[in-house]
């Protein structure tokens, strides 16, 4: 390929990435983004006005003030009207932006806890997210279900290094710090699947520390949460039952599954693994093929993964273990085809 064409391809590549992951800070899907977006548009509008004014002034000076042989260019020193204008206009613009910013900061106030908020505890790990619904005790990882129209209050910390929790389509990012609790709240105005990302460099797989937020109507969320509370792992097929035995022998020391003796806390809770659309914290699609590859060689698929490889598992054991993990579904899980943006 001609190297001179590479710069021309950059916008196409970036555009393709945007279309795939639909991460957009200008999305008006939450009150936070709406307020901040309006402020950014106001600042952009003033920037355009100033730019147009500067271009006009430069052209005016070039055309009207150019020097001819023997001419004395017109002088503007002592022009009180011009000097007052050059001081008053920037002062007015800066003042408007200042007070608009103060008003926006007061409106969003996303660190305080609303009275009717759903409280979710968030813990960042290298390289995945742990979520606990505080009132119900339901625990999940990497993919979070929330109700629309109701504030969700996040109490966040980290188990190892500093991470940063950010779902751009819903609002502001906040660091998760070991030994500290940081807080914020967000509200999704409409149903959808919103993509998030760790935005604090945290190790080799920082870019692979992703998450998804599934926003559904309140009634649908309540039904899902009730089903998640009542969930007990009960594999039906013979393959899934054999896979449960493999899981207990190979995985239970690090992972937990609700309603079983597996209560590990080192890795993600896998109680609802069959519901998740991805594995590896948003990196790979949740299909049997990728699941078996992940189990066989997690560090090879995600650099820095603390999950050991299991090359000694037979193909039959991998198939059974995958069948068991895919069977772990709660009742009333939202149909993502209906809520996907």
Name what the model sees in each region.
Residues 90, 122, 154-156, 198, ...:
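Conserved hydrophobic/aromatic pocket- or pore-lining residues that grip, position, or stack substrates
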Residues 96, 176-229, 235-237, 249-252, ...:
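Extracellular/periplasmic metallocenter environments
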Residues 115, 137-140, 219-248, 332-341:
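Electrostatic cytochrome c docking/interface patches
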Residues 125-127, 149-151, 157-161, 170-172, ...:
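Solvent-exposed coil/turn segments that connect beta secondary-structure elements
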């Amino acid at each position: 390929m001609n190297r001179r064409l590479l710069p021309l391809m950059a916008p196409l590549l970036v555009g393709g990435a945007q279309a795939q992951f639909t991460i957009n800070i200008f999305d008006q899907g939450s009150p936070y983004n709406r307020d901040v977006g309006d402020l950014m548009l106001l600042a952009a509008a003033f920037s355009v006005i100033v730019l147009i004014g500067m271009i006009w002034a430069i052209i005016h000076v070039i055309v009207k003030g150019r020097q001819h042989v023997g001419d004395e260019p017109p002088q503007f020193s002592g022009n009180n009207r011009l000097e007052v204008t050059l001081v008053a206009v920037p002062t007015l613009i800066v003042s408007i932006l200042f007070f608009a910013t103060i008003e926006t900061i007061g409106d969003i106030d996303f660190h305080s806890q609303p009275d009717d908020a759903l409280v979710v505890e968030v813990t960042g790990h290298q390289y995945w997210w742990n979520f606990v619904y505080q009132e119900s005790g339901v625990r999940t990882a990497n993919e979070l279900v929330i109700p629309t129209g109701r504030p969700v209050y996040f109490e966040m910390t980290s188990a190892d290094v500093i991470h940063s929790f950010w779902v751009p389509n819903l609002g502001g990012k906040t660091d998760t710090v070991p030994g500290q609790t940081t807080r914020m709240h967000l509200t999704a105005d409409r149903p959808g699947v919103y993509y998030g990302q760790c935005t604090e460099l945290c190790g080799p797989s920082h870019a692979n520390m992703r998450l998804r937020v599934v926003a559904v109507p309140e009634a649908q969320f309540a039904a899902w949460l009730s089903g998640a509370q009542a969930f007990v792992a009960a594999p039906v097929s013979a393959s899934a039952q054999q896979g449960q035995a493999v899981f207990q022998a190979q995985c239970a020391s690090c992972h937990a599954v609700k309603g079983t003796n597996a209560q590990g806390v080192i890795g993600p809770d896998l109680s609802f693994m069959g519901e998740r659309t991805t594995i590896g914290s948003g990196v790979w699609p949740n299909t049997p093929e990728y699941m078996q590859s992940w189990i066989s060689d997690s560090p090879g698929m995600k650099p820095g993964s603390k999950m050991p490889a299991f090359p000694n598992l037979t193909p039959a054991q991998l198939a059974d273990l995958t069948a068991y993990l895919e069977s772990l579904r709660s009742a009333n899980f939202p149909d993502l085809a209906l809520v996907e943006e």
